[in-house]
Amino acid sequence: MSTFVRLAQTSQTLSLAAMEEASRQGLRQADLEHLFLALVLSDQPAGEVLRELGITIDRARRAVDEQHATQLASLGIDTTLPEPGRIVFHETAGYEWRRRASDVLVRASRRGLDGSAAAVLRVLMSEPSGLIAELLRRLGTTPADVVDRLDRLAPPADGGRPVRGNESIVGSSETFVPAPIEDVWEFLADPARVPDWAPSIGSVDLADSAGTAWIGYAPTSRPDGKPVRLRAEFRRRRLELLETRRPDRVAWRFTSPDTAKSGPIVTEFALAPTTGGTRVAITTSWGRRHGWRRVLGLPLRPAARFLAWITLFQIGAAISRAFR
């Protein structure tokens, strides 16, 4: 994977998590502390480094809140900060990085750095304001400790690139979820929770169910309230629970029963406990259509790669968000 592609994917992933964290505090501008929180949640080795130091998302959030209160007190402002709310990033607009935070992302691909989350974390450890050093002090460690652990990391491996088989396109990725494996398994195996992680499912009819198949419906609006336009034959979805093996495996199959123009989509989840939560490996396969549509689809490999990555990214981010 090129440095540019790795940086683009890392930047997208960290930006989403950071701005979600900022939205909990009613902010529209993500700063260094939100970038740090995003790194704690990262599925890349940088996140593992922080979590192995005992830095969970709950502890990191408390440290950020304490630091904000200390900063206000140093200015002579004696006030109680409002409690953070739920994540509302997807329902609102107007988010951006503060310049010093975006500069960290840019510098992570320069001077021999590879654009990974580990590179971002390394740059963040040397930011000059002292904010991150103070957060780490509250969390019982130092920038030097973090850098020492980063120095021991193996080079990052490629991931998320789709493989084209005879009848499908298959993509895979991993995500970190800050919750116990049993809780994550229950979430993924529950048909009522499918709309919380599947972008193509807005609701599920749980009535008259045989227990392994349900009818779902595509979303009619986006989280921000804007309507979604979709042809009638693509409204309904058939959801099949293909496999459940507690507590480490769940597989779903989605089809469109009212049209032959859309192939089946199978999404498999493999769960494993890890420090601070659960690692979820996600594999999605898109069934290929036959005939002239299949021939026309052959040149669209870059588009297929992007579709695979963005779909896997959305699913992984949604699962993590459900437990934050």
Regions found by a protein language model. Name each.
Residues A192, D196, V204-D205, I265:
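A structural signal for the main folded, soluble domain(s) of proteins
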Residues L296-R324:
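A conserved amphipathic terminal alpha-helix motif
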Residues D205-K261, A318-R321:
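Glycine-rich portal/gate segments that line the openings of hydrophobic small-molecule binding cavities
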Residues E48-V49, P195-I201:
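A short gly/proline-enriched turn/hairpin at secondary-structure junctions
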Residues I181, S209, E243-P247, L271-R279:
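A short, structured loop/turn motif at beta-sheet edges
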Residues P178-W197:
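Amphipathic alpha-helical segments
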Residues R253-F306:
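Beta-strand/loop substructures that line and gate deep hydrophobic ligand-binding cavities in soluble
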Residues M1-P178, D183:
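Histone-fold recognition with a strong bias for associated Lys/Arg-rich disordered tails
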